[in-house]
Amino acid sequence: MADLKGQVALVTGASRGVGRGVAVGLAHAGATVFATGRSIKQTEFGAGIISIVCDHTDDQAVEAVFRQVEASTGRLDMLVNVAWGGYERMVENGEFTYIAPFWQQPLWRWDAMVTTGARAAFVASQHAARLMVSARRGLIVNISFWAAQKYLGNTVYGIAKAAMDKMTSDMAHELKSHGVTAVSLYPGLVRTEAVLAANCFDLSNSESPEFIGRVIAALAADPNVSSRNGATLVAAAVALEYGVTDVDGRRPRPLTLADV
């Protein structure tokens, strides 16, 4: 397991799902983790994780989070942008509007995915970069998905994920000379609370939320992680490179564009 003792991470959107799993995975690797979410509760986490209630569409609240991190630890080594929106209310007035063509999409979904997702990641990355650039170290991980490269049933989703990947690439260009690395990371099918509740997915090649945290921990512990700056990475493929297994000991098969 990667050793992140002495390192400080901030994980956004950690109330549940992938974000929660990332926070737990990084804490298990020894990092001090600040975990944010609109409905997050400290009692749900163990040692090594400090929860902060934060709505990432509120710029002042986000700024306060970073002030708290800096005041508490004096450093920030990792930012993992997981906060997202737009999956709620997939069915409206009896219709599955999530897969409606773009001209029939409710505009609140654009606001949720682009504002709660891409814009929130940009704002958090701005604050993180200010701490990391001055220290000449740091890793920013933007959780993204194949919808950035292929139509997956929702135009807004594709636009928002493409924005995440382009943001990663351009941020990496500007961060390169400052010792800071930025990457996009694609999970596979993750056994989140929502996926398990749906009870309609083939979970034979699925990943636990904690698996994504283990992968990020391995990246953060790699002294040569800067060689990946600006890259789009597949979590399961990175896991194979570093010998990372899931919590049940399995090694999920990496997905490709043809698989999704």
Sequence positions of predicted segments:
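Active-site loop of short-chain dehydrogenase/reductase
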Residues: 7, 75-76, 97, 132-144, ...
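Conserved glycine-rich cofactor-binding loop
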Residues: 8, 15-16
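Conserved glycine-rich Rossmann-like NAD(P)H-binding loop of the short-chain dehydrogenase/reductase
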Residues: 29-44
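Rossmann-fold cofactor-recognition segment
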Residues: 47-60
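Catalytic loop of short-chain dehydrogenase/reductase
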Residues: 85-86, 99-109, 139-163, 168-177, ...
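A short, exposed helix-loop element centered on a Lys and neighboring polar residues
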Residues: 125-126, 169
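C-terminal helical subdomain
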Residues: 184, 201-260
